[in-house]
Amino acid sequence: VGSEMCIRDRYKEHAWAKWGKRVLLALVCLGLVAFGYLESLVIRGAHTDGRAEDAQCVVILGAGVNGTTPSLMLSSRLQAALDFIADKPDIPIICSGGQGPGEDISEADCMADWLIAHGVDESRIYREDRSTSTQENFAYSEEIMAELGLDAGDMFAFVTNDYHIFRAGRIAGTDAACGVAATLPRSAYYDALQLNYYVREAFATGWLLLRGN
């Protein structure tokens, strides 16, 4: 009898182990499917919206500043913005970004200074230096757009890195927002860095969607 009970106990343990492995495998598969879906959203959004050509204003979303110098990511956004406005001499430009740790000046001031140094007329540039997040970038920039006489439904472009376009567009919360994609130079190092950002962005996008955005 004792041996039979021992066999039954071992069978139950084995059955539970098999069931546990199946559940774990199912969860892993579900996680991979969810990650694949989120990554597809990031990748599909990683391009410049053709409607941006009709934008009435352009907002450059801030990124890190090293002292007073734009970081790699911010430099790529500034170059993309400079290329975008090349044939739009009258469009107002909002440089949006506050001052964070390790930054001697605000991101807005850093961007404005860079644009002026690259030949952009200072009278076109508006500095939004209060924001500390993408949500605040848009909220405070919309206040400036209203002061410029733009209506809520007027098309505006926002410049950010390609991997950030989808999430930033969701945060903007309006069809009037058109992304302009900034990309990094091509090299083995930059490609690896870009891959890292794309993976991280999928998780950030998932968190955003879970919060109902």
Predicted regions span which residues?
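Solvent-exposed, charged interface segments at domain starts and junctions
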Residues: 3, 13-19, 94, 99, ...
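N-terminal type II signal-anchor transmembrane helix
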Residues: 11-49
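Short, small-residue-biased leader/transition segments that mark boundaries at the very start
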Residues: 1-7
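A structural signal for short, hydrophobic/glycine-enriched beta-strand patches
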Residues: 39-199
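Enrichment for repetitive, rod-forming helical segments
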Residues: 28-29, 84, 174, 207
